[in-house]
């Protein structure tokens, strides 16, 4: 098993900070329409996944009886 030393962990954290800074400097704020579209799509997908989970749970509970 490979054990990380304190030096390696600090290097990893520094590299992560640099990567995050680079990502934030390139990222841009979405406009209102794009943001609303993303919110609606996310909520729709969550509802579909929840509905599928409910149907699976209902089906398995009916089969087990």
From Swiss-Prot:
InterPro entries to which the protein is assigned, alphabetical: Prot_translocase_SecE_dom_sf (IPR023391), Translocase_Sec61-g (IPR008158), Translocase_SecE/Sec61-g (IPR001901)
Cellular compartments per GO CC: plasma membrane
Residues spanning the membrane: 44-64
GO biological process: intracellular protein transmembrane transport; protein secretion; protein targeting
Protein's UniProt name: Protein translocase subunit SecE
UniProt key word Transmembrane: yes
Subunit structure: Component of the Sec protein translocase complex. Heterotrimer consisting of SecY (alpha), SecG (beta) and SecE (gamma) subunits. The heterotrimers can form oligomers, although 1 heterotrimer is thought to be able to translocate proteins. Interacts with the ribosome. May interact with SecDF, and other proteins may be involved.
Domain of life: Archaea
Family: Belongs to the SecE/SEC61-gamma family.
Location in the cell: Cell membrane
Task performed by this protein: Essential subunit of the Sec protein translocation channel SecYEG. Clamps together the 2 halves of SecY. May contact the channel plug during translocation.
Membrane topology annotation: Single-pass membrane protein
Signal peptide: none
Any one GO molecular-function label of the UniProt entry: protein transmembrane transporter activity
Record keywords, A-Z: Cell membrane, Membrane, Protein transport, Translocation, Transmembrane, Transmembrane helix, Transport
